[in-house]
Amino acid sequence: MPIGTPSVPYRLPGSQFERWVDIYTRLGAERILFLGQEVNDGIANSLVAQMLYLDSEDSSKPIYLYINSPGGSVTAGLAIYDTMKYVKSDLVTICVGLAASMGAFLLSAGTKGKRLALPHSRIMIHQPLGGTAQRQASDIEIEAREILRIKEMLNKSMAEMTGQTYEKIEKDTDRDYFLSAEEAKNYGLIDRVITHPSES
């Protein structure tokens, strides 16, 4: 049986009474966002809107993005990535559990020095996936060119974010490449492994 979204008590600023709100609303009030599912257009639109709102409220305060995601849509993920780079607020990214594929890309896109992971996190990078359905050969060729273009763009960005060479990123992402939190730190995907909120 599904659990649903938990509710928690929250006192609005200036109010003497508490009310029950969903946990994500409460976390958002503390500038905490959570990517806890596959990246798709819906979650991307929600995260983009929340980042834009929080940045417009106070761009001097960081936004915390917790990630436990198997990855997902490249185009949806790039919408999140572009917004992370667009806002003035620092983006503190924190891996809790798994950051794979686009999840790992977004983890490493946080503000340099503020890309974090909990000790038992797993990070996985690989090349973008593309599907081939029963279509005309010319359509498949067009899609293949686009996938290769996206792969090159993602590899260049990841090389820049990690400090690794483009050639190393290209080689390592040829297949699923899993790293522990400590290995991800040494690789340059994150900056620190943390065990307590005060370390973020």
From Swiss-Prot:
Fourteen ClpP subunits assemble into 2 heptameric rings which stack back to back to give a disk-like structure with a central cavity, resembling the structure of eukaryotic proteasomes. The keyword rRNA processing does not apply. Belongs to the peptidase S14 family. The active site is at residues 101, 126. It is an enzyme of class 3 (hydrolase). It is found in: Cytoplasm. This is ATP-dependent Clp protease proteolytic subunit 2. The gene is clpP2. GO terms for cellular component: cytoplasm; endopeptidase Clp complex. SUPFAM superfamilies: ClpP/crotonase. Cleaves peptides in various proteins in a process that requires ATP hydrolysis. Has a chymotrypsin-like activity. Plays a major role in the degradation of misfolded proteins. The keyword Protease applies. InterPro entries: ClpP, ClpP/crotonase-like_dom_sf, ClpP/TepA, ClpP_His_AS, ClpP_Ser_AS. Keywords: Cytoplasm, Hydrolase, Protease, Serine protease. GO terms for molecular function: ATP-dependent peptidase activity; ATPase binding; serine-type endopeptidase activity. PROSITE patterns: CLP_PROTEASE_HIS, CLP_PROTEASE_SER. Its main location: cytoplasm. Its EC number is 3.4.21.92. It catalyses: Hydrolysis of proteins to small peptides in the presence of ATP and magnesium. alpha-casein is the usual test substrate. In the absence of ATP, only oligopeptides shorter than five residues are hydrolyzed (such as succinyl-Leu-Tyr-|-NHMec, and Leu-Tyr-Leu-|-Tyr-Trp, in which cleavage of the -Tyr-|-Leu- and -Tyr-|-Trp bonds also occurs). One of its GO terms (biological process) is protein quality control for misfolded or incompletely synthesized proteins.
